[in-house]
Design a protein with these regions (language model features):
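Short helix/turn-capping signatures at newly exposed starts of structured segments
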Residues: 1-424
């Protein structure tokens, strides 16, 4: 049985680890992987058809704990104890719920002190006791009319006993219903940069690079670290040194063994095998990959990841909050006779639906089907995705119409121009 400390409006944990409100989904998963001997079973629950419609949930079924993550930010919003009998809970070092200590209303009152009168739902027969950042739920079979005169003790029940808490919630703010995840805590930065948003830089219908708004740990102030934000630009043709100086060391370096999309290139059979292996810098906390040319070590491709559940790479990256402006499809000849339309653009984000995007942009008519598998697992339980080309961009689309990734390629003249400007 887990022995955990409750910190209202903040966390649930022990000396070795803790689940902190505002932490990213992947960080919670990392904790569970490190505690595999103590946390036996975990379920991932999400809406397969529309992952943005409801919370992303990690359920520790053998420990009575559920972690509810905001579907957009993928940060921890609510910590729920759905079975008080499966975990030992303490507050300020004093146990208030365990096999030996029953979490009655009187016990909660003794451990946490006075609060506002609770709320009784006669229809559901539920009594809820609220503190700031903390709520307890009690199932009550039958209650007399509550008289809130002297605090909790004024609530009377027919059999004279004190109801036992069946659930507990830890959240940010005063209201569980309106709770939202706080910003990523400084204690969860671990010296990594995090992405606030990314803008794709384009000119004359060609992609030039990306502009990143980053958040990282700044200089300490009175022994307390603080957040530091900055804006960086990366363009095609940038050197490895440029990328390292702007983004820092990557989370991982991956060398390409082969180009599986090469077969779709014109006259692919005439191309000589590459003597140098291209390589990726993977920035997991930015939701970004950058590909370098193996011969000249110049940046030639960006990959932006949206990290939706149901995708093969889910939980590997944080979501890349990108903005991409594309020219809208030209109106029909009949429409142009009636009105003179200036060139218009549409904005594509990590939350855009492909069926809405493809109606307004000129894309490749037939998609390429992408089957993903690893060397140790030749089956992909999430199924295939579909790749569509739009100018110098490839959109990877999931069966539910959400965009899984966006790949930005460099036009040769852009990459050459940028690399030459670096040499001047």
């Amino acid at each position: 049985m887990l022995d955990l400390e409750v910190v209202p409006e903040r966390s649930l944990g022990c000396e070795q680890w803790e689940f902190i409100l505002g932490m990213h989904f992947s960080q919670a998963v990392c904790i569970m992987q490190s505690q595999v001997n103590n946390i036996k079973k975990v379920q991932v629950i999400y809406n397969e058809d529309d992952p943005l419609a409801s919370d992303l949930v990690l359920s520790l079924t053998h420990d009575g704990i559920r972690l509810l993550f905001d579907s957009v930010s993928q940060r921890l919003r609510v910590i729920e104890i759905f079975n008080m009998n499966m975990v030992k809970l303490k507050y300020c070092g004093i146990v208030f719920s365990s096999p030996e200590v029953v979490p009655t209303i009187d016990q909660i009152d003794h451990s946490f002190g006075a609060t506002h009168p609770g709320v009784y739902d006669a229809e559901k027969k539920i009594f809820t006791l609220n503190f700031r950042g903390l709520s307890f739920v009690f199932h009550v079979e039958q209650a007399c009319e509550p008289r809130y005169v002297r605090g909790l003790g004024s609530l009377q029940f027919t059999n004279g006993s004190s109801p036992v808490a069946s659930k507990m919630y830890i959240f940010n703010g005063n209201s569980l219903i309106d709770s939202k995840p706080p910003p990523l805590p400084i204690s969860c930065f671990f010296s990594h940069p995090y992405l606030q948003n990314l803008e794709v830089l384009r000119h004359n219908n060609a992609t030039l690079g990306v502009k990143l708004s980053l958040l990282c740990e700044g200089p300490s102030q009175v022994l307390e670290p603080r957040r530091h934000s900055c804006v960086q630009e990366l363009k095609f043709g940038s050197s490895v040194q440029d990328v390292l100086s702007l983004l820092g060391a990557p989370s991982r370096v991956f060398y390409k063994a082969e180009d599986k999309m090469r077969i779709h290139s014109p006259q692919a059979h005439l191309r000589a095998p590459a003597l140098f292996s291209d390589y990726f810098y993977n920035y997991f906390t930015l939701g970004l990959d950058v590909l370098f040319d193996g011969k000249h070590h110049r940046l030639k491709k960006f990959v932006l990841h949206t990290n939706y559940p149901g995708h093969y790479n889910f939980n590997m990256y944080h979501r890349c909050e990108f903005n991409l402006h594309l020219p809208a499809r030209s109106p029909s000849a009949e429409a142009t006779r009636l009105i003179d339309l200036s060139p218009t653009f549409i904005t594509v984000t990590a939350y855009s639906r492909w069926d809405e995007v493809c109606e307004r942009v000129q894309h490749s008519s037939r998609p390429i089907v992408l089957h993903r598998s690893s060397s140790t697992n030749t089956t992909n339980p999430f199924g295939s995705t579909f790749c569509y080309g739009v100018e110098d961009i490839i959109f990877e689309v999931m069966p539910n119409n959400l965009i899984a990734s966006v790949t930005l390629y460099a036009a040769e003249e852009v990459a050459i121009a940028n690399s030459k400007s670096d040499l001047r």
